Amino acid sequence: MSGEQEPDDSYARVRAVVMTRDDSSGGWLQLGGGGLSSVTVSKTLQPGDSGGTEFLVHGERLRDKTVVLECVLRRDLVYNKVTPTFHHWRIGDKKFGLTFQSPADARAFDRGIRRAIEDLSQGLPASCHGESETSEDGPQVNKEDHYSTHNNDHFFRSDSIPTEELYRTSVIRPSPFENLNPRRAYIHNQVPLKPIRHVSFQDEDEIVRINPRDMIIRRYADYRHPDIFRNDVDREEPEDVTFFTKTDSKKPSYLYSPANGRDSLKEQKPVEVCKIQPTSSLKKSKGKKEDGEHSSCVYCQERFNHEENGRGKCQDAPDPIQRCIYQVSCMLCAESMLYHCMSDSEGDYSDPCSCDASDENLCLRWLALITLSFIAPCMCCYLPLRACHHCGEMCGCCGGKHKAAG
């Protein structure tokens, strides 16, 4: 079931305890006596000559190298975050669970699952590395360059591109009926009108790098409304076209000359290539680098600028004010009541203050909360205090701050 994995095809790699569902007791038990396992979310080649890809969750116990988890991801996956360190998911009638060592590992695994499902839904090409292939529009480009070009508009934010990373160039073969002009960029006449953005990414940044602000999670109760299938925010469009001459390349670039036939090669030292790039994003990245030092946050695993780090910048960092509001307003009583009275067979229940009209227990839940507020009047203070806290986050007075690792 698992193919030969490439390091670049890994979405997440964490250590966790693999759990199994016990239908008799309605709970979760450690699989095979427990023990930490190395769990990886990756893209692998399907066995046989089909040449397709599949997205796999693979778990191997560390102490004896036994494979304890082998799960092929599908589009009908339902992912639940029960606690900050315990997540489980269901594919058809099969259920899988993981207990993580820390909330940071759980968040990294969650982001890896979302990225894998996103790529599965979009339908990535079967191979992203190797020799050149012919695209549907006619031009022949290198597979590695085609992968970074095709998927940048769909899955990656261009503001995370390092400016010091050199751009990879791709030379597109012109039609033998077109005139060869070294002062122009060659674009096939069947290429769509929408320009293709051509950028490159660092290998380690492709594994798990999602801005946590794309999916706002206030606390672990939000797992009851799965949004792993939600698309990212609207992608920014390329703003301009820049022509540059690459003169310091160590390898010569070759163009097919129509004058000497399709099989002849013509070497040119200075080659002008049409590069489409978002200048605003590059300037923004360059400005960030000049502003101050960047570090990785221990809570959200994202890189941040020390000079721009303030309250409310990290959604995963501990927030003492929010914790105080939660305790003062006795929200623990509300969640306990919902867990014992309105949870399903999995032990899941809706967020106490959710107004989702699709919830069949919406009216009953709010009626129970109003009744409970007569016993604990301090619950009425939660919504006003939470609104004030949100205003404080917008002003930079409240919220969690990034903390540098190490």
Curated annotation (Swiss-Prot):
Main localization (coarse): membrane
Membrane disposition: Peripheral membrane protein
Protein name: Sprouty-related, EVH1 domain-containing protein 1
Record's GO cellular component terms: plasma membrane
Source species: Xenopus tropicalis (Western clawed frog)
Subcellular compartments: Cell membrane
Residue span, KBD domain: 195-247
Function: Tyrosine kinase substrate that inhibits growth-factor-mediated activation of MAP kinase.
